[in-house]
């Protein structure tokens, strides 16, 4: 085949001749930027106005490295000039009108460092003088406050004692401050024990102060014998509480009763009931029935007067009931609420008194149903002459009635799921 009839190569494009290619000359580099981390330069083309300037990647201007270096040197010179102006403005001396840094040599850097150190030293000295003047002024104004603080105090102020006129404690007359103090009997008694205040001439305050120190409070325990039916932990807490209250009432003041309304809501016990309760503790140990009777009589006074002494029969009944009640309460307290189980009566299959199954001695009539439990197979069968249905093990009847068993299993239908 000739060359004219060859297939053209679609992948190749014929380039125009080199004679018609225009060459563009770079006149100057005007700017620099970064796009996606890659540097680009603003190129001014010779023979074209500034509107035709283009951004070219730095790789495309490799033959213009002299112009790129000239642009970088110009940028460095401008940055250096701006830094020199900023340093000149920060100086306080008026003589420094122009920038001092002209060369980047070692001698110029030493001079600038020495000058900056001298300026910093002058500034720190001026600030220290200003601080000293301020401190002197503060000391002059604080002299009066020191005199007030050093004034001797005649009485320890507190929030519970000082009234609305308590700001006069630090005045020149210490005697006037003591008259403006509100004296509560409890605080006064505490201060009198510690000798913090002088005894006052008011009769009302002296009467309300405590004359005798309060007695120590303790719970009264019942003496027990070896044959006592119950321990001290089974004693009702109401009786111990009511016996300890007379001791508490003897230690309280009239001022304590007037301080809060919550103290009035507490149960009070009369002198007669307290004497009776103390007599009970001094006598012989009581049984649980007598203790219950005494607590009930103390709760209702008129009901106790109408009732007589407890009989022996009643005490015995109370004791018998209390043992069962205590045992139930203790069992309920031991296990938490979530773990408590309901108690059901024991269920047992009734014992067979009559013959059952093969023991009937009758012939097999029909096999009705079968069920398997674990590895055992049971058959529901009826006997001839008996209407009841019995469940027997297959091993008991497979030797005597094999044909009927086979006939039953053949009659079953096998259901295949769809």
Curated annotation (Swiss-Prot):
Q: Which parts of this chain are annotated as the region Required for interaction with del/deadlock?
A: 353-418
Q: What is this protein called?
A: Chromo domain-containing protein rhino
Where found? Nucleus; Chromosome
UniProt biased composition (Basic and acidic residues):
218-228, 276-285
PROSITE patterns, per database record:
CHROMO_2 (PS50013)
Region (Disordered) residue spans? 84-167, 199-337
Taxonomic lineage per UniProt? Eukaryota, Metazoa, Ecdysozoa, Arthropoda, Hexapoda
Copy the domain comment: The Chromo domain mediates binding to chromatin through interaction with the histone H3 N-terminal tail. Binding requires di- or tri- methylation of histone H3 'Lys-10' (H3K9me2/3).
Phenotype for residue 48 to A = Abolishes binding to H3K9me3 peptide
């Amino acid at each position: 085949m000739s060359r004219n009839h060859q297939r053209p190569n679609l992948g190749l494009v014929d380039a125009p001749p080199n004679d018609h290619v225009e060459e563009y000359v770079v006149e100057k580099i005007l700017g620099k930027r970064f796009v996606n981390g890659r540097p680009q330069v603003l190129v001014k083309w010779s023979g074209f106005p500034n509107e035709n300037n283009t951004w070219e990647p730095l790789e495309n201007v490799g033959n213009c490295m002299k112009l790129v270096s000239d642009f970088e040197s110009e940028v460095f010179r401008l940055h250096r000039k701006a830094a020199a102006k900023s340093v000149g403005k920060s100086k306080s001396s008026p003589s420094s009108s122009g920038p001092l840094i002209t060369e980047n040599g070692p001698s110029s850097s030493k001079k600038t460092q020495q000058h900056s150190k001298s300026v910093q030293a002058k500034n720190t000295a001026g600030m220290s003088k200003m601080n000293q003047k301020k401190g002197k002024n503060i000391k002059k104004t604080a002299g009066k406050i020191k005199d007030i603080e050093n004034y001797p105090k005649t009485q320890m102020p507190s929030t519970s004692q000082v009234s609305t006129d308590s700001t006069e404690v630090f005045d020149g007359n210490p005697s006037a401050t003591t008259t403006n103090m509100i004296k509560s009997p409890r605080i006064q008694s505490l201060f009198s024990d510690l000798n913090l205040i002088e005894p006052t001439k008011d009769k009302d305050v002296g009467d309300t102060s405590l004359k005798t120190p309060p007695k120590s409070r303790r719970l009264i325990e019942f003496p027990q014998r070896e044959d006592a039916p119950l321990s001290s932990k089974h004693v009702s807490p109401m009786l111990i509480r009511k016996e300890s209250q007379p001791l508490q009432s003897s230690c309280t003041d009239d001022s304590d009763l007037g301080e809060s309304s919550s103290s009035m809501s507490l149960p009070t016990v009369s002198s007669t009931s307290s004497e009776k309760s103390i007599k009970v503790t001094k006598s012989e140990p009581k049984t649980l029935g007598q203790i219950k009777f005494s607590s009930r009589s103390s709760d209702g006074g008129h009901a106790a007067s109408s009732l007589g002494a407890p009989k022996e029969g009643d005490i015995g009944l109370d004791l018998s009931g209390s043992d069962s009640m205590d045992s139930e309460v203790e069992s309920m307290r031991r296990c938490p609420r979530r773990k408590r189980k309901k108690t059901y009566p024991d269920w047992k299959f009734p014992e067979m008194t009559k013959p059952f199954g093969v023991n009937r001695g009758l012939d097999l009539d029909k096999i009705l149903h079968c069920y398997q439990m674990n590895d055992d197979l049971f058959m529901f069968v009826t006997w001839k002459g008996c209407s009841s249905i019995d469940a027997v093990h297959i091993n008991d009847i497979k030797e005597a009635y094999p044909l009927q068993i086979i006939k039953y299993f053949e009659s079953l239908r096998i259901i295949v799921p769809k």
